[in-house]
UniProtKB/Swiss-Prot annotation:
Tissue specificity: Restricted primarily to the region of the embryo including the SAM. Expressed in the outer integument, but seems not expressed in the embryo at the torpedo stage.
Protein name: NAC domain-containing protein 18
Name of the gene encoding the protein in the UniProt record: NAC018
Keyword DNA-binding: yes
Known role: May encode a transcription factor involved in the elaboration of shoot apical meristems (SAM). Together with NAC056/NARS1, regulates embryogenesis by regulating the development and degeneration of ovule integuments, a process required for intertissue communication between the embryo and the maternal integument.
GO CC, one annotated term: nucleus
Length: 320
């Protein structure tokens, strides 16, 4: 088959298009508004698709012959028969061949209130060399052909009996496949994985900030499965220290106030049980003061201080 160098000859005329114009037609639009009009010799909406016999060129020569396009290129091309009396198209090119892949996809038109098959879309891949030992390339072709071709008359069949022309026009979209999309997808998933790891690490740090309780501060009421208030406070100054749980005892009656503060922060005094500047006697705790003293201690002692959006107990250094 004759080969033509893409570097020779004048470049195809460029269409007069407005700035920012993009050509991204659907399959239906390609068949109805371009291929069908071309086959019927009707003027096209815009002269943006060049007439090129694709099988006389290798795919890397075609972008220079296109009227428009940067990443994909559109052409009107004739199709020839592989054998004079057969219906198989000739897919041979200059230094290789086009091989069909997958099954034909119907092009459906939804205009007029119904669905109608108006064309067929076929996907092909270019192979360098000769079949069946060709080397697969990244060049892809989408070939569109009409399905409503008029039946061939007997006289026409006699005139075309020795002709190799199978179709006067098919519409082809050519592009080169690359791995940039897959690479970007993998890169995106990698970043998501890293972000999740950092998020989990930050949450572990925040959890450890509250999990590692300083020595001398105990939480049997929080981490115990026993809901009996008498098991939490034994009425004396020993054990876990009654003053440390005066808040929990006050809210044990079912008041809605127990929902306002996390259990880990329900302490009236951080100096009790820790041995830091406190000489309070058991008489000032539950066994000496009763529930009324509990309410008084709640009003007199600031429970939490807002530091940077985190409520902390006064007198306790969470970061030591």
């Amino acid at each position: 088959m004759e080969s033509t160098d893409s570097s020779g000859g004048p470049p195809p005329p460029q269409p007069n298009l407005p700035p920012g114009f993009r050509f991204h037609p659907t399959d239906e639009e390609l068949v109805i508004h371009y291929l069908k009009r071309k086959a019927d010799s009707v003027p096209l909406p815009v002269a943006i698709i060049a007439d090129v016999d694709l099988y006389k060129f290798d795919p890397w020569e075609l972008p220079a012959k296109a009227s428009f396009g940067e990443q994909e290129w559109y052409f009107f091309s004739p199709r020839d028969r592989k054998y004079p009396n057969g219906a198989r198209p000739n897919r041979a090119a200059t230094s290789g061949y086009w091989k069909a892949t997958g099954t034909d996809k119907p092009v459906i038109s939804t205009g007029g209130g119904g669905s109608k098959k108006v064309g067929v879309k076929k996907a092909l891949v270019f192979y360098s060399g000769k079949p069946p030992k060709g080397v697969k390339s990244d060049w892809i072709m989408h070939e569109y052909r009409l399905t409503d071709n008029k039946p061939t008359h007997i006289c026409d069949f006699g005139n075309k009996k020795n002709s190799l022309r199978l179709d006067d026009w098919v519409l082809c979209r050519i592009y080169k496949k690359n791995n940039s999309t897959a690479s970007r997808h993998h890169h995106h998933l990698h970043h998501i994985h890293l972000d999740n790891d950092h998020h989990r690490h930050d949450m572990m740090i925040d959890d450890d900030r509250f999990r590692h309780v300083p020595p001398g501060l105990h939480f049997p009421a929080i981490f115990s499965d026993n809901n009996d208030p008498t098991a939490i406070y034994d009425g004396g100054g020993g054990g876990y220290g009654g003053g440390s749980y005066s808040m929990n005892h006050c809210f044990a009656s079912g008041s809605k106030q127990e929902q306002l503060f996390p259990p880990v922060m329900m302490m009236t005094s951080l100096n009790q049980d820790s041995g830091i500047g406190s000489s309070s006697s058991p008489s000032k705790r539950f066994n000496g003061g009763g529930v009324g003293d509990c309410s008084t201690s709640m009003a007199a002692t600031p429970l939490m201080q807002n530091q940077g959006g985190i409520y902390q107990l006064p007198g306790l250094n969470w970061y030591s």
